Amino acid sequence: MLKNPATKYRPFPAIALADRTWPNKTITRAPIWMSTDLRDGNQALFEPMNAERKMRMFKMLVQIGFKEIEAAFPAASQTDFDFVRELIEGGHIPDGVAIEVLTQAREDLIRRTMESLRGAKRAIIHVYNATAPVFRRTVFNTDREGVKRIAVQSAKLIREIAQTMPETQWTYQYSPEVFSGTELDFALEVCNAVTEVWEPTPEHKIIFNLPATVEMATPNIYADQIEWMHRNLARRDSIILSVHPHNDRGTAVAAAELAVMAGADRVEGCLFGNGERTGNVDIVTLALNLYSQGVDPELDFSHINDVARTCEDCTQLPVHPRHPYVGDLVFTAFSGSHQDAIKKGFAVQKPDAPWEMPYLPIDPADVGRTYDSIIRVNSQSGKGGIAYLLESGYGVAMPRRLQVEFSSTVQKLTDASGREATGADIWALFQQTYLRSDGAIGYVSHRLTERDDGSQHIRLVVNIDDHEHICEGSGNGPLDALVHALSHVLTAPVSIHHYEERALGQGANADAIAFAELAATGVAGSVFGVGVDANLTTASIRAVVGGVNRLIARTGQGMLRRSSAQATVA
């Protein structure tokens, strides 16, 4: 790179539009959408689509809701010409949908292109020629008058041919190619000259498409250009003002949105931003940006994964995993703080309330995505994401301190493996950590009775070193009685710091899950035990026994009183 890029590159000049109005505008309705996937998108592929893939793409575009679809560049190849004929003769174009075809401003190409449309009910004939100074000098070696003459002559020829094909409802479209690099006064001069030839009316409008064939400046500059044309075009009420942004600077979506605010009625683009070089503007992102603001985009992306897979199959181009709204990772949070915020957001979000969710601009369900992949766990994740995966996938709603405890266990797993931990991985680790049955003390059975004084008495059968033993104890409640019973086989007193219980899932037949936080005298910290059983009391006993086993493991079996465990204790 140059130390001083100013010696090679010049900044794009600002537009003199001191009273611009677009910054104060809001988009309140969708523009007219025109898909150029089958033309601009197709010509930019390593391997252009064959007829079968083009037809598959066309039918999907119709299903999504596009009313204008640029089908081909018929004069460019026999394949494109034949595809247009198949659309017409095969009856594939629904009522209310117009196909568009593109031609350069040359007589032979215009005649060939118009012939491809013979018999169509509705058609848009789109002619273009480059108007920018660099093209006038370098490519065509002509002046302004020469460029305008080409546009006017082409417009006249198109009108003459169209009048010989009255069975078709025609819409004429003209593009000053490289509009973004053309002097505004000259772009206006050429467009107004074409208007004089085509003589549009408010009932029969023409389209002027103003492309950022190459994106040359910031989106506000393009918006200024569009607003200037919007104000100054002759017969503006008889013109559909269209934009065709490319993404060379990475801001095509912003450019299109600001252009609509500046007066554009129509947007041309491709699904997922396919197209020459860095691509056309992405209509999916534009449409769903509108949707996220409560504006009906008039395109249906309810099954966005299906749209993405079809595009990938037809174009042989992958959709990036972080592509807005559709990428595999766009509704995914790995960060611990993000996961915690999303988990809390889902807890308070009501089905009929406005969507207010941390880190998720739209509800994934609206585009056919599930919540399964929203929270994924790697070495950067925190307790919130882990808790969400266990609760959403397995019904385990952990107490907060258990979330903290278990997250460190998961962290060790992801640090060691260096990979993402799936919900299944986390559930398996949870079972291995809290629900294993091979602890020092194995629960066998119990009998709980209430004494005359209101206290509870438990007769607990446990397995220690492959021998069954009976431990008995009394207390103010079942858990207090259980702790007293277990004290006979432990060298240190155990206390229950926290206890929670809830259903594991929904319905009358759901198992119970219990969580007990235990501490022992002389043992640093506390640990959790978890118990699952169809019977709530049994689940609570399993939780306490599980926690005791984890304390015993922490002390290297030092807490287990084996000498007393060789016989029945009471």
Curated annotation (Swiss-Prot):
GO terms for cellular component: cytoplasm. The keyword Repeat does not apply. GO terms for molecular function: 2-isopropylmalate synthase activity; acetyl-CoA C-acetyltransferase activity; magnesium ion binding. SUPFAM superfamilies: 2-isopropylmalate synthase LeuA, allosteric (dimerisation) domain (SSF110921), Aldolase (SSF51569), post-HMGL domain-like (SSF89000). Keywords: Amino-acid biosynthesis, Branched-chain amino acid biosynthesis, Cytoplasm, Leucine biosynthesis, Magnesium, Metal-binding, Transferase. The keyword Magnesium applies. Pfam families: HMGL-like, IPMS_D2, LeuA_dimer. It catalyses: 3-methyl-2-oxobutanoate + acetyl-CoA + H2O = (2S)-2-isopropylmalate + CoA + H(+). PROSITE patterns: AIPM_HOMOCIT_SYNTH_1, AIPM_HOMOCIT_SYNTH_2, PYR_CT. Its cofactor is Mg(2+). GO terms for biological process: L-leucine biosynthetic process. Residues 437-570 are annotated as: Regulatory domain. It is found in: Cytoplasm. Mg(2+) binds at D40, H244, H246, N280. Residues 31-305 form the Pyruvate carboxyltransferase domain. Homodimer. Belongs to the alpha-IPM synthase/homocitrate synthase family. LeuA type 2 subfamily. This is 2-isopropylmalate synthase. It comes from Ralstonia pickettii (strain 12J).
